[in-house]
Amino acid sequence: MTRMACAVLCAVAAAVAAGPTIIVANQIPGGRGQTAISGSIPYSVGRALPNTLPGWTRSPKITMFGRSSLWEHIDGAAEQYLAFEFQDLATATYARTAGGTATVEIYRMIDPQHAYGIYAQELSPTATRVAVGVEGRAGRNSVKFWSGDFYVKLVAPSGSAAPPADLLALATAVAGGLGEPGKPPAQLSWFPPAGLVADSIKFVPADALGQSMFSSAWEAKYAGTPEPSTLVIVPFASTDGARGAMAKYESFLGRPGKPAKKLAAPGDGAFTAQEGYYGLIVVVRSGPTLVISLGAASEAAATALVTDAMRRVPSPPAGPKGTGGTP
């Protein structure tokens, strides 16, 4: 173990033993120890935000926000975070011994899938990939990463004396206090790599493509001419659920005198339609999953991409006879 690593671990241990003072928005200050927003907080705030780290000292208080008070901290963005099943936020400011400050925000989401989702939603295409958490990116004065159920942002004021390397070191220490980072969502492997636009895979928790029946969907962009096409994958709990949603979407896309066109293959059912915004749309069902191509240059290109994606989506385990509908 290096001297630096030992120093970080010792500092974290000391901070946890002391216990932070936590202020909960809209509540009486909770004093020393960990204060719940609603129920218990399933991680150590003091371990994630220790009092001192090599080169950094935390402000005396940690402020926490829950689902009903998040708007006080990020008024304009609170609704989006709630859509990604935000649970609570712990935030504190650190002062750098050599000058400069940085604010740390730890957003706990309901699970790793939603933590990835909000991280990907705010991903900057100009940020540099850094090794922190499951995945992280660093900008000129910021580091953002996700780890387990958490989405974490560290931001130094514009023109701050804190160099990027020191900000990354602080981010790494915070990540270490959050426990095992976990792994990228398995759904990322559903998307064929050929033509996939970098950093375009998003998790859509609800109302994908403006359809209330499309929840927990995944989408990505694919290189195309003149514009990239979109691939959307929507898993359902049952084959009947997927079949019913497909029928509703087909009805939605149909126009008087120009209904959707049925396709014999691929999958367990398919159709194609034209839409004013996306252009060509190809929808295929494979068991309890819908795979949708929007805006591809041709039906052949869309079908090839959808077919490739279907091969990558794992088939659900076979249940007792009579459950989940039939293909």
Residue spans for each PLM region:
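Positively charged n-region of N-terminal signal peptides that target proteins for export
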Residues: 1-5
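Bacterial N-terminal signal peptides
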Residues: 7-16
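Signal peptide processing junction and immediate N-terminal pro/mature segment
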Residues: 16-35
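Short Gly/Thr-rich strand-loop-strand
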Residues: 50, 55, 59-84, 109-148, ...
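A short acidic-to-branched-hydrophobic micro-motif
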Residues: 82-118, 152-154, 219-245
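Short, low-complexity cationic-aromatic patches
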Residues: 94-100, 136-148, 163, 220-230, ...
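A mature extracytoplasmic/lumenal domain signature
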Residues: 108-111, 120-122, 156-159, 235, ...
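Surface-exposed amphipathic alpha-helical segments
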Residues: 158-188, 295-327
